[in-house]
């Protein structure tokens, strides 16, 4: 997790390809310091259900299922498979002794993007901000 003396924003763009990142990264650099711009490969499945839950829980998917079975839905089960991400992150922060002021926003629908823009100060005020943007949907903002 990030250093406690720096404000940090994690921008997680779901369904985002590396070539898309390369095309917009220069625009973001005017507003944010990009600490690292590397390409990584991992054994973690990249399907949204697995990847995003693992990122926020700090656990592999099988461990999430074993530790919190009431918060994990398998592929064959109906329901939202990423509905506990903020809860997973709170748990991870507590386990690591991080008592940061944080904000967590998911942008799936256009009105969620507009609401975030209207309340952007909460992102600036937080020690750690997470913005999850689902690129698979129509443009949010």
What residue spans do the PLM features occupy?
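Secondary-structure capping and boundary motifs in well-ordered enzyme cores
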Residues: 5, 17, 121-125
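Generic structural signal for short, solvent-exposed loop/turn connectors between secondary structure elements
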Residues: 5-7, 30-36, 140
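His/Asp/Glu-rich, glycine-adjacent segments
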Residues: 41-141
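Catalytic-core region of right-hand nucleic acid polymerases
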Residues: 16-56
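Short, small-residue-biased leader/transition segments that mark boundaries at the very start
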Residues: 1-3
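Beta-strand elements within well-structured catalytic alpha/beta cores of enzymes
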Residues: 7-24, 55, 129-133, 139-141
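Generic, low-specificity signal for short hydrophobic/alpha-helical stretches with a mild N-terminal bias
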Residues: 6, 10, 37, 111-113
